[in-house]
Amino acid sequence: MPRKERDEKRRDNKGRLLKSGESQRSDGRYAYKYIDTFGEPQFVYSWKLVPTDKVPAGKRPCLSLREKIKQIQKDLDDGIDTIGKKMTVCQLYEKYTRQRGNVRKGTQKSRQQLMKLLSEDKLGAASIDSVKLSDAKEWALRMQEKGVAYNTICNSKRSLKAIFYMAVQDDCLRKNPFDFQINEVINDDTVPKVPLTPTQENELLDFMQNDPVYAKYYDEVVILLETGLRISELCGLTPADLNFEKRFVNVDHQLLRSTEDGYYTEAPKTESGFRQVPMSAAAYEAFERVLKKRRDGRCIEVDGYKDFLFLNRDGLPKTAVNYDAMFKCLAKKYNKCHKEPLPDVMTPHTMRHTFCTRMANAG
């Protein structure tokens, strides 16, 4: 083919010479064909050949083709996956969680919660290569403005840092936009957890013991205060977990419940979670009273465990939600008739916090 004819084929409708890989479509849009890091042909498009060109009326502003080519060439030179970097944040998170599927049910629920937050926010639909440090910080601010708890934002940010780290390792990105300190962006507005003072502890137990409504919960609160058990560990206790001869409580599982799965058990998160908790004299007596007063409940077995110690009014094992509601109402009633109110945050964990504080102070 003569040189003149070849040059005419490589010029745009303005007479400008097009470089290798560049072309112009019949609608006026420019195209560039290149081979990605996997050896596959790819195309990018633009309404402008160079930055000084004007975008046709009615078309969205865009980078010129040659600006895009420059970016692509830099990515290819650096070994960046030019296709992978275009996946959305939601797609990246889905890829990350799919590769790490062997997790606890609690972790699964946390993942679902984060995916929901991402799907409802503009960050989720953004391509990962477009997310900058300032975008990540703006996301944290939006979450706090939305009313998401500080600890939830911290955990979510930690997960997002992990998925973007994977993207960097996979050569989809050069930098991790979530590599920053969260406390530099948002304030910790979490209400501090305060343990009961010795006076509050004694007065609370006296109040419960003599109250017609809360007397039935007295032994459970004594056990929590004397053992420091997590509420899910308390809920999972069966007679087989109590060793009265050697005076200890065996902890190797916890009982939980969800709307989707119903009752289920989980082992402690770490090896140190498997333990034998000593029974104090008060805990020993409380457990004896619990067994003596325990009524027969429904015949229910959860993952091989049965005969749970603490049952609700329907004869089913209690779970954390039962105690959360109880402690909230207990604190409200107690505060009405006591000058020194209980801590603002009064939950089953307050009992564990009180126990741990007492042990630490005792040395």
Where in the sequence are the language-model features?
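Short alpha-helical segment immediately N-terminal to, or the first helix within
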Residues: 143, 223-224, 358-362
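Basic, Lys/Arg- and aromatic-enriched nucleic-acid-binding interface segment
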Residues: 154, 169, 173-175, 179-237, ...
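Conserved tyrosine-mediated DNA breakage-rejoining catalytic core shared by Y-recombinases
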Residues: 237-295
